[in-house]
Amino acid sequence: MFVAKSIAADHKDLIHDVSYDFHGRRMATCSSDQSVKVWDKGDDGEWHCTASWKTHSGSVWRVTWAHPEFGQVLASCSFDRTAAVWEEIVGESNDKQRGQSHWIKRTTLVDSRTSVTDVKFAPKHMGLMLTTCSADGVVRIYEAPDVMNLSQWSLQHEISCKLACSCISWNPSSSRAHPPMIAVGGDDSNGAYSGKVQIHEYNENTRKYAKAETLMTVTDPVHDIAFAPNLGRSFHVLAIATKDVRIFKLLPLRRESANSSGPTKFEVQVMAQFDSHNSQVWRVSWNITSTLLASSGDDGCVRLWKANYMDNWKCTGILRGDGSPVNGSSGPSAALSAVGVPGAAQMIVGAATAGRKKAQLMPG
């Protein structure tokens, strides 16, 4: 059972992304008004805006939290061709009494020549690493060699994907059997490149990332992509938001010999495909146990998907943009562009039409 709670986000333009921190008690929103807002859940159960500041000179597409092991750190990316890293500084006590916190810019990453469309921190077992992707098809991986000095970031890898990148997702598996892996989605609408999703894997021998797989069946623009938490599986599960919702299974094929080099080859299977949104799907997000997938689309609804014991995926719930449950089909309402699931219990939705500048919260 989900109960809706509306948040007057007070953004002056469209909300593009909503992101929870690791514990699900802080969230960040970003908007075309060029700002980022940070929200904290109080003891009263209400969400309070504790910081709001202009971050970029263009629309802010994405915002994401680092693992709390590295402190209170955010990254954002923008149409202004940059990504930025922000750190919260403990301010004076009177600021805390007013419920405000200070965030300062630690660095600006300026390598991209086009809009930076997504930004993600790598899984914490890899250290403090940050990945960006750009509309010109380049994925960049940065590392902070000293986690105590977030003003210094070195560019470790540049991956040319040859497609207009729109979204990225790290494989969260920390198993030594799985090399670091990143999925990249593209949203160019031309048919020059048939496969709009690529899987790149780190090669220990060459110390570079190489393309391991292209999902050739994904031919429409991809808006979001998300690896499921691994939880000891021998295969990987990848959710994709395109003109519908798709869930893929990537099963690593056994290498011919232990000494064989080159990226892993995968057997790619479609686990599920849903066109229930009857429209473009903008966000997909897993819960922490990878048992529940949430998707949001232009039909103005969030849909929840769950697999039964036979591994058949079915819709287990539909929520409108205002948080009300849907019985049966629903007509279009405000288009939803952002959905995040920090755990099994919470979900956040950002409304993405000019008339929708609120964030909608559904705690379970």
Curated annotation (Swiss-Prot):
Pfam families: WD40 (PF00400). One of its GO terms (biological process) is protein transport. WD repeats lie at residues 10-49, 55-96, 111-152, 160-210, 217-258, 276-315. The gene is seh1l. Component of the Nup107-160 subcomplex of the nuclear pore complex (NPC). The Nup107-160 subcomplex includes NUP160, NUP133, NUP107, NUP98, NUP85, NUP43, NUP37, SEH1 and SEC13. Component of the GATOR2 subcomplex, composed of MIOS, SEC13, SEH1L, WDR24 and WDR59. The GATOR2 complex interacts with CASTOR1 and CASTOR2; the interaction is negatively regulated by arginine. The GATOR2 complex interacts with SESN1, SESN2 and SESN3; the interaction is negatively regulated by amino acids. The GATOR2 complex is negatively regulated by the upstream amino acid sensors CASTOR1 and SESN2, which sequester the GATOR2 complex in absence of amino acids. In the presence of abundant amino acids, GATOR2 is released from CASTOR1 and SESN2 and activated. It comes from the Eukaryota. The lineage of its organism: Eukaryota, Metazoa, Chordata, Craniata, Vertebrata. Keywords: Cell cycle, Cell division, Centromere, Chromosome, Chromosome partition, Kinetochore, Lysosome, Membrane, Mitosis, mRNA transport, Nuclear pore complex, Nucleus, Protein transport, Repeat, Translocation, Transport, WD repeat. Belongs to the WD repeat SEC13 family. It is found in: Chromosome, Centromere, Kinetochore; Nucleus, Nuclear pore complex; Lysosome membrane. GO terms for molecular function: structural molecule activity. Component of the Nup107-160 subcomplex of the nuclear pore complex (NPC). The Nup107-160 subcomplex is required for the assembly of a functional NPC. The Nup107-160 subcomplex is also required for normal kinetochore microtubule attachment, mitotic progression and chromosome segregation. This subunit plays a role in recruitment of the Nup107-160 subcomplex to the kinetochore. As a component of the GATOR2 complex, functions as an activator of the amino acid-sensing branch of the mTORC1 signaling pathway. The GATOR2 complex indirectly activates mTORC1 through the inhibition of the GATOR1 subcomplex. GATOR2 probably acts as an E3 ubiquitin-protein ligase toward GATOR1. In the presence of abundant amino acids, the GATOR2 complex mediates ubiquitination of the NPRL2 core component of the GATOR1 complex, leading to GATOR1 inactivation. In the absence of amino acids, GATOR2 is inhibited, activating the GATOR1 complex. This is Nucleoporin SEH1. InterPro entries: G-protein_beta_WD-40_rep, Sec13/Seh1_fam, WD40/YVTN_repeat-like_dom_sf, WD40_repeat_dom_sf, WD40_rpt. One of its GO terms (cellular component) is GATOR2 complex.
